[in-house]
C-alpha cells in the first residue's frame, strides 16, 4: 500500500440486511428504487448498485445525467431515474442511454418529446409534483393542465408520477400533519392524471422515513436512501429500525507520546493537557472528511475503548487522548465511524450530533482519497 492505513470498509452483508428491512417494511408487491446518488452517499455507487441489483432492486435513483450514464456503462440495466431532471442539451443522451428523468416543466417535456421523436424512441419521464417541498415540481394546482398537455406528446412514456416529503422524518404532530397533507395533495394529482387517461407505471413519494412510517396505499414504489447505508432518517426513529452500519472508517495509531501538564495540542492550541496525558496521532483529517467541527468533540474506538479527539482536527491528522486505553500501542486499529471488531460502534448519528450536522453529510463527506474496501459481496 502506497498511501496510508486509513480506509473505509464497506460491508455488503450489512447492506443486504438493511435492504431486507426495507422489504419487510413495505407492502407486498411494492417496488424499491434505491437512492445511489452522490456516490451512494459516499459508499461507492458502482459496487453498491451491483450488490443491490443482485438483490432484485426495482430501480435506482441518481441526481443527474452523468451518474446515470456511469451506471449504464458499468453494466447496470435496471431502470435508472434522474431525480434532478436533465438540463438543456442532455436530452439526447438521456434517451440514448435509456434513462428515465424527472420532469417538472412543459418546456422540458416538449424538448424531450421532440428529441425522442427524432430518435424514433420513447423518452421515459416521471412527472414531479410539488406538494409542499418547495424545491422542484409542477405546482399541484397546475397539474391537471400539465397532464392535459402531456397527453398530446406521443413520444413520451409516463413511467411515473413523483413527489417528495419535506418532513416525513419529523414524527411530532406538526410534522405528521404536514406529511399527511402532502400525501393527500399527491393522491389527488395522481387521480387527476388517471382521470385524463394517463396510466403511470410507478407512483412514489416515500423516502426512507415514509417507507417505514407512513401508509400510502396509492403508491407502488418507495425510495430508500439513508436507511440502506445503516443510519436513521432522524432521531425520531430511534429504536424503530433494525439497521446495521455498512461503513467502517478506520485508521491506525501512528505515534504515541506522553505530554506534561500545560502542553498544548494542535493548531490554535485549543486543547491543553490538564495533567500528564498519553496522546496518539492518527493519520486522518478533514481532507478525508473527518470534520474540523469534531475538534475537542469527536470520539473514536481503540481496543474497544472510547477515546476523545483532543485539539484541532488537521487536514491529515487528529490527536486522541488514549490515557485510559489499556495496552494501547502504535499500529492499533482506530475506528472513527462504524463498528469495530468487537461490535462497539461510533454511529454516524453521533458524529453528526458532535459536528452539528446530519448523518447524510457525514457519509457524503468521506473523501475520494480514502480507499473503499468492499467486504462480503455476493458476486
Swiss-Prot record:
Cofactor(s) required for function per UniProt: pyridoxal 5'-phosphate
Keyword Isomerase carried by entry: yes
Top-level division of the source organism's lineage: Bacteria
Active site: 37, 267
Residues that hold substrate according to the record: 135, 315
E.C. no: 5.1.1.1
Reaction(s) this enzyme catalyzes, per UniProt: L-alanine = D-alanine
Top-tier EC class: isomerase
InterPro entries, per database record: Ala_racemase, Ala_racemase/Decarboxylase_C, Ala_racemase_C, Ala_racemase_N, Ala_racemase_pyridoxalP-BS, PLP-binding_barrel
SUPFAM superfamilies, alphabetized: Alanine racemase C-terminal domain-like, PLP-binding barrel
Residues bearing the modification N6-(pyridoxal phosphate)lysine: 37
Record flagged with keyword Cell membrane: no
Annotated keywords: Isomerase, Pyridoxal phosphate
Pathway: Amino-acid biosynthesis; D-alanine biosynthesis; D-alanine from L-alanine: step 1/1
An example Gene Ontology biological process: D-alanine biosynthetic process
GO CC, one annotated term: cytosol
Signal peptide: none
An example Gene Ontology molecular-function term: alanine racemase activity
Role played: Catalyzes the interconversion of L-alanine and D-alanine. May also act on other amino acids.
Annotated family: Belongs to the alanine racemase family.
UniProt name for this protein: Alanine racemase
Species per Swiss-Prot/TrEMBL record: Geobacter metallireducens (strain ATCC 53774 / DSM 7210 / GS-15)
GN (gene name): alr
